[in-house]
Amino acid sequence: MTDRPVVPFLCVHNAGRSLAAKVLLDHYAAGAVDVRSAGSEPATSLNPAVVDVLTERGLDPTREFPKPLTDEVARAADVVVTMGCGDTCPEDPETRYVGWELTDPAGQPVEVVRGIVDEIDTRVRALLAELAGPAA
């Protein structure tokens, strides 16, 4: 484990769920976590509804872009969070994996995407609290 935990979020397209999780954890962790994201079949662009919802929250996802999933992403991680990539996500026996069952925001209206991002937000906050451990 490094000084900063490494947490990649993995999904199929790296345009919605994993993007939202990365942006949210980056925001809440304020540099205390090395946050990454990738997709097993990366999209060519970000999900516009997810971008809109994150922007509504005062976050800037515009520096992000869909990235391909590599074995190195998993090997460098302390905790890997998967979101629907199933068997296409690489697994390293030395790494802890957490699977988050979440609706894919692709093609969903912004009202539905808000609920998905709310759920991701709740899980990201819980993960950050777990990574921080008990207060000294």
Model feature map: region roles:
Residues 2-136:
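Short polar/charged helix/loop
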